[in-house]
Amino acid sequence: MKLIGITGMPGSGKSAIINLAKENNIPVVSMGDIVRHETLKQGLILNPENVGKTAIFLRKLHGKEAIVVPCLKYIFEKYKNEKFVVIEGIRSIYEVNYLKKHVFLEIIAIHSSPKTRFERLSARNREDDSNSLDTFIERDNRELDFSIGSVISLADYVVVNEEEYDKFLENLNSLLKKIIMNVDE
């Protein structure tokens, strides 16, 4: 099995590659879903503050691999016969190291400027997003505290999402095919 890890700051455009993976019948597992699930289990509403606090709590309680361990277990149980699985939401170098100990992993980082990301997050209106600049900056700092910057800098591929959306999708689709086929187009 080969894992295709997706990383990037909130609002960078990670959902585009998730949608492409699904269109290509590649299973997708989101690490954020585990955190959101745990937030709800604690009886909290989904908002940036509660989701962030839950992520920090889980890491304090179970260590720096707190999110990735149940994720990989889930992948092995549910998708053991798949050649490829996309895992979205890798945020720390500890998660990368854990995954690489257990499975072949290639990482795609999606990058967008803070200005672009803030505009997207303000517009998409997901429960754990905010249109407050202060909350946006807080969230970015929390992500950076998890060491997402290290994951992005060590990614096997970096795709910049500042251009026209169709061109971005075209670039992502080509990259996904390259990884799956293991050939250059």
From Swiss-Prot:
It holds the Pfam family AAA_17. It comes from the Archaea. Belongs to the UPF0200 family. The keyword Nucleotide-binding applies. InterPro entries: NTP_hydrolase-rel (IPR022970), P-loop_NTPase (IPR027417). SUPFAM superfamilies: P-loop containing nucleoside triphosphate hydrolases. It comes from Methanococcus vannielii (strain ATCC 35089 / DSM 1224 / JCM 13029 / OCM 148 / SB). The keyword Ribosomal protein does not apply. ATP binds at G8, M9, P10, G11, S12, G13, K14, S15. One of its GO terms (molecular function) is ATP binding. Keywords: ATP-binding, Nucleotide-binding. This is UPF0200 protein Mevan_0592.
